[in-house]
């Protein structure tokens, strides 16, 4: 389709009307460029797909929504906007699209949040009820569906009143009533516990109401995981050929796609025996009380017992083999080099893949049959069995996926990382098996790049080391296929608005020097805190261990610090805002996740402290396997893997500071390797251009601490 004069005029008119809606709107050349690039790509005028880096301040959301809606209407397609986190998804759904509705009055949009973000009306009714009979009936389905106290019951009753009165849409983030994590866990549900069409509340269930709205919407706001699942099953969303797709926060896409090639599950022999026995009893119950129309052959008790016995014997053999690779009776880990399993283990995994897939099929068959019996059996007993069968299906789905991955030699031309771990819980040994695919470009090509005609991949950060190479390698997007890669200029004047501070640290932030380095960092941070120049501060760490050591050094000012994990992130940010706006000092402290999606403008954040260059963990089995594979191809892992990842993380961290034209402040990076190592200049060159200062650090005396024992992690 060509961009007609009428379509261009419509996009321009909406953009002009938008300027009238936003107070103090500042026209930006990068925004106009993005609107044009997005329009040309979605209309099929230029290239296959577009990867466009739009720095903070460009206004990327509205830059893809305006042309996207115009072209979707012209082509009678659905515009799907996908994000990586709930905060951005909710911002688009609750703020950006309602703003556009003012200039596009008949705009129809909806959101497809994950099931866990919605209240389950069945659970809510149980927890809101003050009548013992109602509580007893529903508590029979789940022991946790009774309120802990009268105050909790009243809170749930208010929530139910809002839901029934259409004052609340059932989303956790859309109510002012406080819901702690424990209560929400009981109010919501997951796929395994959802009764779906068999539920009395199905028609008014907020989750299913939202899913039905998708069919009528012009714009659907989804998340990457849902989009990937929908492309795999051709469910929830319209057919790929009838979509226009925007992947916001597109740098997360390879990680989300990797979920399809990632599985960890317990394989302890005694645990497995218990699960198989419970499933056999469940099948017997179904055959006795809810006999299916057609009996699956495997439901025969003798056949099922023989099948489960073979599964158990294989699992027991695998446990015995894996134990030979790990020290006896203690926590341990064994990784298989290049993901290559011994022949004996590979044969076991291949057989388990077939056997557990058969059990998965049996569970699914019974579940489908049970779902058709709601009108002819005791509803409470039937629903109880449906829930149990749902959970069995989930377990066998996970096991089938695990052994299928374990049986794969490669994915997207790269090995599948495989390792086993042994843990001790309450004095008992538990064995786990793990599989993670290193590359997912083939999956993305099959599900997205080849299926959807035109896709926009965007984010404030898509490049690392000023290059799209890492994105191309991980995603499979490539110029040869007609994909375009565009990096927009920042609308901000970083030279005038901020500065980069690299203190003259005596120690590098290595494991050997960690204690001394953190002591120096704490001393400089304390000096900055005592100067009272900054009311809003952010401190970012590369590891939880380092963050805890830092907190020990500044324990006397702990009340000023809002630390990740103390409360949910959104509450920490709310409290930070309130403190700063009331003239108090406030310091947010967190890990890499706080370097993304945190939008604090002006006085809310004027100083960012970065512990060190965040290289990926060298003890991760996935990173080690990837390194082995790269070396086998005569590629240098540090250049391909570590440095691009560190650059990407650093760009995101530094990007927390300048969020608007009114922002002023400084970024403090406690890592002298930026100035002393050859790669340091390359990392600096990928950052916005700030003036650099190198102040002295207060003297500190620290006794070296014994090296902590490190456990490997993925």
UniProtKB/Swiss-Prot annotation:
<dbReference type="InterPro" id="IPR014013">
    <property type="entry name" value="Helic_SF1/SF2_ATP-bd_DinG/Rad3"/>
</dbReference>
<dbReference type="GO" id="GO:0003677">
    <property type="term" value="F:DNA binding"/>
</dbReference>
<dbReference type="InterPro" id="IPR006555">
    <property type="entry name" value="ATP-dep_Helicase_C"/>
</dbReference>
<dbReference type="GO" id="GO:0046872">
    <property type="term" value="F:metal ion binding"/>
</dbReference>
<dbReference type="GO" id="GO:0051539">
    <property type="term" value="F:4 iron, 4 sulfur cluster binding"/>
</dbReference>
<dbReference type="GO" id="GO:0005524">
    <property type="term" value="F:ATP binding"/>
</dbReference>
<keyword id="KW-0411">Iron-sulfur</keyword>
<dbReference type="GO" id="GO:0009432">
    <property type="term" value="P:SOS response"/>
</dbReference>
<dbReference type="InterPro" id="IPR006554">
    <property type="entry name" value="Helicase-like_DEXD_c2"/>
</dbReference>
<feature type="binding site">
    <location>
        <position position="199"/>
    </location>
    <ligand>
        <name>[4Fe-4S] cluster</name>
    </ligand>
</feature>
<keyword id="KW-0408">Iron</keyword>
<keyword id="KW-0413">Isomerase</keyword>
<feature type="binding site">
    <location>
        <begin position="54"/>
        <end position="61"/>
    </location>
    <ligand>
        <name>ATP</name>
    </ligand>
</feature>
<dbReference type="Pfam" id="PF06733">
    <property type="entry name" value="DEAD_2"/>
</dbReference>
<keyword id="KW-0004">4Fe-4S</keyword>
<dbReference type="Pfam" id="PF13307">
    <property type="entry name" value="Helicase_C_2"/>
</dbReference>
<dbReference type="InterPro" id="IPR039000">
    <property type="entry name" value="DinG_proteobact"/>
</dbReference>
<feature type="domain" description="Helicase ATP-binding">
    <location>
        <begin position="17"/>
        <end position="294"/>
    </location>
</feature>
<dbReference type="GO" id="GO:0033677">
    <property type="term" value="F:DNA/RNA helicase activity"/>
</dbReference>
<keyword id="KW-0067">ATP-binding</keyword>
<dbReference type="InterPro" id="IPR045028">
    <property type="entry name" value="DinG/Rad3-like"/>
</dbReference>
<keyword id="KW-0378">Hydrolase</keyword>
<dbReference type="GO" id="GO:0043139">
    <property type="term" value="F:5'-3' DNA helicase activity"/>
</dbReference>
<dbReference type="Pfam" id="PF00270">
    <property type="entry name" value="DEAD"/>
</dbReference>
<feature type="short sequence motif" description="DEAH box">
    <location>
        <begin position="248"/>
        <end position="251"/>
    </location>
</feature>
<dbReference type="InterPro" id="IPR011545">
    <property type="entry name" value="DEAD/DEAH_box_helicase_dom"/>
</dbReference>
<feature type="binding site">
    <location>
        <position position="194"/>
    </location>
    <ligand>
        <name>[4Fe-4S] cluster</name>
    </ligand>
</feature>
<feature type="binding site">
    <location>
        <position position="205"/>
    </location>
    <ligand>
        <name>[4Fe-4S] cluster</name>
    </ligand>
</feature>
<dbReference type="GO" id="GO:0016887">
    <property type="term" value="F:ATP hydrolysis activity"/>
</dbReference>
<dbReference type="InterPro" id="IPR027417">
    <property type="entry name" value="P-loop_NTPase"/>
</dbReference>
<keyword id="KW-0547">Nucleotide-binding</keyword>
<comment type="similarity">
    <text>Belongs to the helicase family. DinG subfamily. Type 1 sub-subfamily.</text>
</comment>
<keyword id="KW-0347">Helicase</keyword>
<keyword id="KW-0238">DNA-binding</keyword>
<dbReference type="InterPro" id="IPR014001">
    <property type="entry name" value="Helicase_ATP-bd"/>
</dbReference>
<dbReference type="InterPro" id="IPR010614">
    <property type="entry name" value="RAD3-like_helicase_DEAD"/>
</dbReference>
<protein>
    <recommendedName>
        <fullName>ATP-dependent DNA helicase DinG</fullName>
        <ecNumber>5.6.2.3</ecNumber>
    </recommendedName>
</protein>
<dbReference type="GO" id="GO:0006281">
    <property type="term" value="P:DNA repair"/>
</dbReference>
<feature type="binding site">
    <location>
        <position position="120"/>
    </location>
    <ligand>
        <name>[4Fe-4S] cluster</name>
    </ligand>
</feature>
<feature type="domain" description="Helicase C-terminal">
    <location>
        <begin position="517"/>
        <end position="698"/>
    </location>
</feature>
<keyword id="KW-0479">Metal-binding</keyword>
<dbReference type="GO" id="GO:0003678">
    <property type="term" value="F:DNA helicase activity"/>
</dbReference>
